[in-house]
From Swiss-Prot:
Protein's name according to its UniProt entry: Altered inheritance of mitochondria protein 11
Record's GO cellular component terms: membrane; mitochondrion
Coiled coil: none
Annotated InterPro entries: AIM11
Entry annotated with the keyword DNA damage: no
Entry's localization field: Membrane
Transmembrane annotation, as ranges: 42-59, 88-110
């Protein structure tokens, strides 16, 4: 047993009695479930920290570019030594950083709330939340219309090898 695994198991063993003492449902959960929820929490907290860093960076870069005129200088004309291309590049980069960090925070927070760890689980969760299983059962009970049955039979014939592509059914020689 490695040192990391030993420290993790001792950490988990100290956590379970605490959770059970205060009647948390998580106290009855398995170690894998607790580790999974911990990973989801760490992802969310990391993206939240990145969002805080990005917003602070955007604030500082905005304040540093603010035009403050001297005492007897007009406040309507910016200085002539101003580089608009650099300002635009910094604005695009800062906006992209803010958008990405806030989006990651929303996504990881939603996944933490919904207990989703991968794309397959996300698909299952969305299908069950939107009533996909019930609607699928209702659709399977409905009778199939004539055109859909014809297309389905044709596709089944192709998949089973019953259809000959060389023979098109028309007589070209006559």
């Amino acid at each position: 047993m490695s040192v990391e695994a030993a420290s993790n198991s001792s950490d988990q063993s100290g956590l379970k009695p605490f959770l059970a003492k205060y009647n948390f449902k998580l106290g009855e959960a398995s170690d894998e479930y607790i580790a999974r929820r911990k990973r989801q929490m760490v992802l969310f907290m990391s993206s939240a920290a990145l969002t805080i860093f990005a917003s602070r960076f955007a604030y500082k870069s905005t304040i540093s570019r603010q035009y403050i005129p001297t005492l007897f200088q007009g406040n309507h004309a910016p200085p002539l030594s101003y580089n608009f291309a650099t300002d635009a590049a910094v604005a695009v980069g800062t906006g992209t950083l803010l958008c990405g960090s806030v989006s990651s925070m929303v996504i990881f927070g939603s996944c933490w709330i919904l207990d989703v760890s991968n794309f397959k689980e996300f698909g299952w969760k969305m299908k069950s939340m939107m009533g996909g299983y019930e609607k699928e059962r209702e659709l399977s009970k409905l009778p199939m219309d004539e055109e859909s049955a014809y297309i389905q039979d044709g596709l089944n014939d192709i998949l089973e090898g019953k259809y000959d592509f060389d023979e098109d059914g028309t007589e070209e020689g006559k």
